[in-house]
Amino acid sequence: MASALALKRLLSSSIAPRSRSVLRPAVSSRLFNTNAVRSYDDDGENGDGVDLYRRSVPRRRGDFFSDVFDPFSPTRSVSQVLNLMDQFMENPLLSATRGMGASGARRGWDIKEKDDALYLRIDMPGLSREDVKLALEQDTLVIRGEGKNEEDGGEEGESGNRRFTSRIGLPDKIYKIDEIKAEMKNGVLKVVIPKMKEQERNDVRQIEIN
């Protein structure tokens, strides 16, 4: 009897660690290519518009807009963001947990797709035109913002600085990514991404009917 009990304890102790290891969740990571960036900055443009120029930047990962820009964190496609907005409108509880009022009124960001273009609006209170940078990394629109926290008053490089980064994927066969326009005014960033007409798309081929 004693030997059977000891054998049972030995078997249970050898099996338990393996079962716990099976339940351990897997960790995945995703890297983004930031070579040959086409970026929008404030050089050579009057007013609040953002002009286009080319540069190369080192690979860098920043914090996402966890408060006002969560729908685009991490990188999402346009269709995913539009589907997410549909869910917000249909589910008031989900809207409230993602920075939208229970009535469905959007707060902090908005995105609309029309026949001619995709219209994106992001509220960035406390940030100026010089604090915001837009870039195209391959087919991904990257929005970065950096500004000082007035409450902390820290110097550059200290914890008083706020840094934000968020991304949205743009298919180059649907949108004219070389004609993106951006405007920053009164703490609101507006981005217009023109769409290609059907006859301009090289992935659409008309088939002749005999």
Curated annotation (Swiss-Prot):
Protein's cellular compartments: Mitochondrion
One Gene Ontology term, aspect cellular component: mitochondrion
Segments of this protein annotated with the region Disordered: 145-165
Keyword tRNA processing recorded: no
Gene3D superfamilies: 2.60.40.790
Family: Belongs to the small heat shock protein (HSP20) family.
Subunit and interaction comment: May form oligomeric structures.
Protein's UniProt name: 23.6 kDa heat shock protein, mitochondrial
